[in-house]
Structures are given as C-alpha cells and as structure tokens.
Amino acid sequence: MNREFEGKKLLILGGNPETTPLVQIANDMGIKTIVTSGRSTDHAKKAAWKAYDVDGMDVDGLIKLAKSEKVDGVLVGVADILVPSYCKVCGALGLPCYATEKIVEVFSFKDKFKETCEKYGVHGIPEYKLDADCKREDLDKIVYPVMVKPVDNGGGVGMTVAYNEEELLEGVKKALDASYKKRFIVERYMQCDDVGIYYSFKDGVCSVSCIYDRYTTDEQVGFSKVNLGSVYPSRHIEDYFRNMHDNAVRMFGDIGIQNGVLLLSGFYEDGEFYMYDPGFRLQGEAPHLLMKAIHGFDQREMLIRFALTGSQGDFDIREIDDVRFRGKSAATLWFLLKKGKIKEISGLEKAENDPRIVANVQRLNVGDTVEEDWIGTERQVLTRLYIICDSREELKNCIKEYEDTVKVVSDDGADMLLNGLNTDLI
C-alpha cells in the first residue's frame, strides 16, 4: 500500500465498530490515527495510534484536541450525527472538508432533506403534520400504521412503528428523546421494496457507484426494521435512471456537492422511489468493501487522501465505477441478535478462508450483552459478511450456507439469532 502520508496525523471522529476498517486502512497507509468519542470502550479506538474520550458533539473540545495534537487532517467516521461537528472543526482549523454548511443542513436533518428533495422532483415519504404539542386536529388526520423518527439520528435510533394513537404518542416521546434538535417527523409506514443508492463525488462529478435491494426483518413488531441483508445490483436500476437520476444530480449540483460519498435510502413502489434517509459519509452497510473488490478502488483511501490534501486523487470516477458490478452478484449478509448475553458463537470461522467472502465486519463477541434498547437498531448486529459470486443463484446458495452454519447461544442456552434473509425473495 502507498505510504506517501507516513507520519501524518489524522483525527477521526467516532469510535463505533463500523469506523474500525477506516482506521485500519489509514494505519496501513502509515498514518498516525487519532480516534475520539465519548466512550472509552469504543471498538475503533483499539485500532488507533492514539485514542481520546472527547465526545464527537463537543466541537470546542475537538478543536482543542486537534490543535494540541497538531493534526494534519480530520475525517468523520461512520456516524451521521457527527457530520455537522466534522464540518465545524475543519472550518475552524482551515482543513479540507468535503461537507459545507449548506450540505450539512440538507443531509443531517430528515425534515430539511425531504423539503429539498421535493423542490427537485425527488420524492420523500408521505408525511403527516404533527408537532410536540400533538394537537387533536392533527392526530385525527393520521392513518395508521406510521413511522415516527427523530430528524437528526440514524441506524434505527429513536424510531417507532405506531399502529394506534397510544403507540404514536409513545413514539413521539422516544423520537424527541433521541433528537438533539428536538424535532421529529411522522410518515406513512411503507410496506414495499427497500433500496439503497450510493454515490461517489469527485471534483463535482457525480457517479452512481451501486444500487442495492435491502431485505429487512419483520420479526420485531413496533420497532424500526433492521436490515437482514442487501443484494447488489438492484433489480430496480433501470427505473432509477429513467425516473429519478437526472433530478437527483441536478439537486446535488445546486446543493454544491464537489467531493465525498452519499447514500440515499428509499422505498420503491409502482415505479417510483421515495427517499427517507441520507448519509453523507461512509456507511455501516459498507458497500465500499464490495466496491473495493469489484471496482478496484477504495473510498476509504479516497476520503483519507482528501482529508490530508484536499484532493481525492488523480483518477476519473466515471471510468472505474460500475453500478452493475461488472456482471457479478454480491450481498451484505447481516446476522441480528435478540436480547441477551453471548456465551458462544460458531460458524463464522469458515469465512476466513472462503474466497466468496471478501470481508467479515464483526460488531459483537462472546461476553457482550445485547440490551433491550438496542432492539430495532444496528447495535443488535452481530456481524456483516460481504459476499461476491458469479451468479445470483450461487449468491443465494452462499447465503443459505452461512445462515445454516452460524449459531449464537446466550448464557441461558437460548438461540440468540433472529430469522435470516429468505433467499426466495431475492
């Protein structure tokens, strides 16, 4: 690996397990990584050159830390909520930042995102008017079920599916508790195909790197649907380019996106796409791991280079991207856990020598406890397997193989795994 940045210091905001691969790549590039977050036990800190407990929301504390360490660059990890801090810290230090205040305003708050999308003909999920006062005239207009969620949190945090008014009012309280801005939205609960659209931006050029179909669990009634797996490329690619792409690119240009990566999560129904969640940073889904294996370039290296130089490198993103994955079929396979303490994990060891598995990003280990308030969020993910096969049928067989093999037992002897992805739906 190129080590042209040997000895440079990079401050990375956020320490969750999904940020660990970013830290590891920077380490491999010879960079001195400094990870900071509010929890001393965060996973990514174990891989860092240095670690601090300055919370990612403490902008003044982050600026002070960056100055004391004389860092050469700052980069946000896999956390939507830290993108505003990233922008402010870089601005105060005069360091490269792929986000701007306008971009942060649009992509860090779901209500502002939806408002912006509609101006460009990019649809958001149908929404009901409701504020913290929960006025009777507004409540009477709501048709259930609905999804209640904070405008400024992700990964399922603070989200509730409500089937009646009592559950709605409880969901409002939960969403407000999880919102730093104390704002929430109430949307129609969509029961249709779920998709992710992942973009790469370089010097103002927008490239669609991948589009995938998400398959979520319906086992946890009343909670946000957590992903069971994603399949690449999506069966809805043609409809995307026919019905949404041009409007989306026009919106990105007017917002002022020049560099970086962006995921738009959405639903597909009757030929139309309804966007519900943007993420202007590397994703927990980590499609960049599949892209590294298939496209041959690594978005992590690209963003690290930008943080240290203000340039993502000398290449044409349109020449190396391929939204159709060069004819391959790929997937991320998520294993979700029920509440309990992990006593035993088996079946994952075979992934180490399986050429179909390009990565295994494990979040939890023996001795860890899945708490009640983790249910319905990505914190209940045991691990994600990244699979690449030559055909869709081979991919389905690989998924079945690992779902039959992987076992997780709690300290009271119970099976902790939720039901997996039904490959008949692929």
What feature does the model see in each segment?
Residues E187, Q258-D270, R318, L417-N422:
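A short glycine-rich, hydrophobically flanked beta-strand micro-motif that places a catalytic Asp/Glu
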Residues A351-V370:
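A structural supersecondary motif
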Residues H123-I125, P145-V148, M159-C192, Y212, ...:
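Conserved ATP-binding module of the ATP-grasp superfamily
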Residues Q312-R356:
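A glycine-rich beta-turn/hairpin centered on an aromatic-Pro dipeptide
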Residues L130, M159-N164, S200-K202, E269:
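Short beta-strand-to-turn element immediately C-terminal to the catalytic PLP-Schiff-base lysine
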Residues M1-I103, C134, G310-S311, L337, ...:
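ATP-binding N-terminal substructure of ATP-dependent carboxylate-amine bond-forming enzymes
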Residues R188-Q191, V195, Y199-I257, V261, ...:
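ATP-dependent carboxylate/phosphate-activation module, predominantly the ATP-grasp catalytic core
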Residues G91-G158:
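A conserved helix-loop-beta module that forms one wall/lid of the active-site cleft
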